């Protein structure tokens, strides 16, 4: 974070990212065919990078600015909770110990900052207020605000937290961490969670080593029971690992924590998001396939069991690629010291095929578990488990409706539906539209929606505020249940009165308070006879933000005691007494009104009834209507909701104390980074995974999804997973798209289902209960007639809503709620208890990128291992060739994300040829209102176009790279789309991927696995929990490409992966790069689809080797390229097997010793990695975060299925690292030779084996040497000569910015290039003595280096190179005399000035400064600002110019961008300023600012200006 691309002086201090950075992204993204999507993507990426980097480097800065600025008093209390010490800090928040001032109960409060800027957004009335109130949790208040807010504020992604809240409300189990309540104020969310002082199981395991089997099974059994309980709700945790398991040492009880990645698995719908920690993720997740959550959780449990019993992990490697491949293969070493039962259970859990994997029920019946059932502790637990089983809570088949039967609510109209609960259901149902869920709730048949609605309603009722003595609770509940008609009337009255009182007393607006307010109001109006008239306690609105109304309620203890017996599905932790705080701008305006009316007696379930029915749940659901208790519950008891009983329950201090005493968990790890702060919070904060669009399944997944489409009810399953929803909600109109898809598909099926169109409730009832997705093998084929019918039914309402507001119910309340928000402005933000409130889903317009990668055709070829024959060490250049159809792989560098320029002339200039216009935009952009089905008929066409786009998507394929390349440019070594396209240096040894599919390959797609056999060994830092031991010979899975099967000297078949997988080291390596581990290499990446891989997909030897190598390194002409199209590597290209002795088998045996000291496969030191906590990766920007291999668990989200891993980082990101010194200490790049290994080419410049390849080589830059990135880029530009960049110190230089264009221009624009080459050669020959750049070379390879010397004259290189110098004849400059002169010139120019003392320099600067002031030239052109900007950047790239973005400003129609530039040779600097003028012309000002000047630099400057003039003139002609 030390340096930004733009100077800090240009950026306000408090900004999370510099203005220049954001502006650059916006400006460059404009050129993209879909600027809105591109800029959004870039901003998400950069924001996630910023957040993650801050988390790593400045953990203290994660506290929100708003919190810091708020008064100390505001942070001392939250409702009844007195805040204590900070237990831990995370990227997006912190966890503090808290004590209930009323009950003395301890809790851990997770404080998640909300960003400002969404308080007053809804006042314009453009969206219903209830909708805009979702600002509280979605950080986006309206479509117009979304982009602005996102660009200005780091995304804490409260939406993910909101999902976590909803899930935790549904789950109450002794082995699951409890959520007591949720509070909020203007700037923060407060999740009041169980406090456990025992710490994480991870810490315990680290301190104790492997556990005795008896103890391990004791804990494991609890884990399985908790997981099984979650599965009974169709909820899958998806991130089970010791770090997320809290241990109450006193009670020896496990608590499952961190539901940030949990998801509801919908019937007939597979989960698609690859998430979790790589070490614990199941193979199906690692392969990026759709999967059932249940079996995946079981796999994770198996890994945890293995770790408990052995002290290390079965699959472990510092190199993420290797780790994932190990998991994918499912091969591990079973320790011989385990008992036979343990080995048997582990072998049944760790099965690759999820359908054959044991289930949680079977685990609990396994002999290993039964073996220790007689333990005294286990007897108690067994009794508890028995109770849970009686409630159907421990079944693992996820047939929710068969297992849980709480009292089911009967709803008769939309008006009865509680908006906050509806919002929660939307979250759980992955963004399904409100109309569809509403339709399901109103249907007679039983449905999962109704069940969850009932459960959430019960939770809400129990956590509502009681405003009267609870002694009357039960009594009043009974009375009210008898008077259903009166209660309905009363609820109406209450609603009206509540609305009136709401206007009169804004302070008490909150969904929780409104229940009580309504109740009291109803009583005051005497409109009800049936409702207990004893609720007369006044509603106290307190003005202080966090003060508490401590209304004593001595009589509530009885009711509370009864409440404790309620089913676990409803946490009984009460909220504080009368939390009547002013509703900060946030929430509830209209929603609370709605809940006011809805949550009134009508919708609440009486506690007693629900308790009965839940305990009864052995009774099948279809009998539900016949059960008197249930029947009364659903009809009358539900209406009796005003019953203060439920309200009082939440108040009972006794109840709180009792429950909490039993469950203290979480946050014991104050000493070791609290589990919360780093896991739950940071995951949520960076939930970019959720922000990314999830596309249709890959071809391999297609069959499953087709089945899904056939059978799945659209209302329940939108085509996108929940994470898509997050992305779309926050950044676009994906919600609209989702609904369109649902409705379109529904419409297509309507005709097919016409005969079934008569919705039969009995059938429906069975359907949903039977359709549970959890059945591991049960795919989408579980559909039921009912669901279809329901969906027809639910679908129709939305069909006719094209003209309606998305939330018509609240439209009329807009004015009221906006005024309410305005009233709130001047006052201090109050803390609101939002335990039961949720904000409306943000329905922003956005883009949905559709990608279906079809690459299976190449598998055949790729399966053929390439012959092994030692060849000279070759360096291959990374080349990305643009493909007409290729969807651009989104990169962090804005310039990477630019599709073809609008101006065809500009395009030709950039790419050296005019290629055909792409048939369609790279992006699929569909707009539509979420609730308008006008475009329903377009579904089919849209899908078709999506297919074409998908096929046009150009997956980044890794082609063979020389085995020496330790780093293989982390970014450029993108393996074809899903497979391992993530640089391992970012993936800490135990991180949690939010989306592993990004880096995982499809099973059928082996080609992407064809990681160059040559890829050099990576220098992986450390193997957590592992140490290298005997290798196991494993046959690679079918999806492992045969290309990888290059055998090393070990001869172990499993080791074939190590060459490639070593290519990227652990993140720690980024921090301490050994100089002897660098190898210069390159690979040629084809950014092409499998069908389009014909363009130069084969790796070429770089020109640094002997002449014959140079010859082969020459880029193949376009005509020849198709020959190599079938595979991603040249068939005749043989890969050197150097360093076989050092290669390791990626499937190395696990250490059997307790120490678990893992030996890194790299040369870096080993460390006992047990202490490194798993990092949950939830960010798509993982590739840009240097996660230290420390105990910090960083949560990064990687969930952008639609975009390839960025191959370059932006200038801004590079500059953050402050990698290069201002002036190179030595212009010659000779240090690198010492860092190359073995018998490498003299010219093999060391490329960092770590993540540095992605940015720049830290060592290179810090030592004043050119970064390998620049070397790589220049070598791409000049295939036959070593780029002059090697000797230059690039300033935050971005690598390979426009390799495609350069390559194309080399190939296609041959004539023009030749002609310019000739001129350039002449020019260079004239100036050779002064301008030829120094080249990295060894004496023995002088000839080769000479060839590499087709360098461009120092400055002249700059622009000349753009078109001409790109591939100037190497022979022209291959003479040794030139080399000599180059060195001399070096001494003359830059070094000369450097060696003078300060006094001489001072005067020299004075004299040269005068020259510099005069050396300025303006170029006026009629091309657009963006085109001029792009041309300039391209010129920089092609002319070996290092540049630094100084300023970029787009204000009031005026666009200005400034760059500080420097030629790769010498100290010759200049400025370029591009300004748009009101008359639509653009002025490019080139100003020389070098402190010293000479003839050659002046000449070069003139030449550069001529080049600029020529380029813009050519562009302007069009």
Swiss-Prot record:
Main subcellular localisation: other
Gene Ontology cellular-component annotations: cellular bud neck; cellular bud neck septin ring; cytoplasm; nucleus
Entry-linked Gene3D superfamilies: Transferase(Phosphotransferase) domain 1
SMART domains from the UniProt entry: S_TKc
PROSITE patterns the record matches: PROTEIN_KINASE_ATP, PROTEIN_KINASE_DOM, PROTEIN_KINASE_ST
InterPro entries named in the record: Kinase-like_dom_sf, Prot_kinase_dom, Protein_kinase_ATP_BS, Ser/Thr_kinase_AS
Example GO molecular function: protein serine/threonine kinase activity
Subcellular location: Bud neck
Enzymatic class: transferase
One GO term (biological process): G2/M transition of mitotic cell cycle
Pfam families per the UniProt record, alphabetical: Pkinase
Disordered as annotated region, ranges: 1-43, 55-83, 467-502, 599-651, 741-783, 856-898, 1005-1030, 1150-1170, 1220-1243, 1259-1291
Low complexity bias spans: 599-611
Residues that bind ATP: 87-95, 110
Protein kinase domain residues: 81-369
Comp. bias (Basic and acidic residues): 746-758, 856-876
Catalytic residues, chain numbering: 239 (proton acceptor)
CDD domains tied to this protein: STKc_BRSK1_2 (cd14081)
Keyword ATP-binding in record: yes
E.C. no: 2.7.11.1
Residues the record lists as Phosphoserine modifications: 511, 629, 685, 837, 866, 1220, 1250, 1284, 1287, 1325
Catalyzed reaction equations: L-seryl-[protein] + ATP = O-phospho-L-seryl-[protein] + ADP + H(+); L-threonyl-[protein] + ATP = O-phospho-L-threonyl-[protein] + ADP + H(+)
Biased composition (Polar residues): 55-68, 492-501, 759-774, 1222-1243, 1265-1278
Keywords recorded for this protein, A-Z: ATP-binding, Kinase, Nucleotide-binding, Phosphoprotein, Serine/threonine-protein kinase, Transferase
Assigned protein family: Belongs to the protein kinase superfamily. CAMK Ser/Thr protein kinase family. NIM1 subfamily.
Protein name, per record: Probable serine/threonine-protein kinase HSL1
Gene behind this protein: HSL1
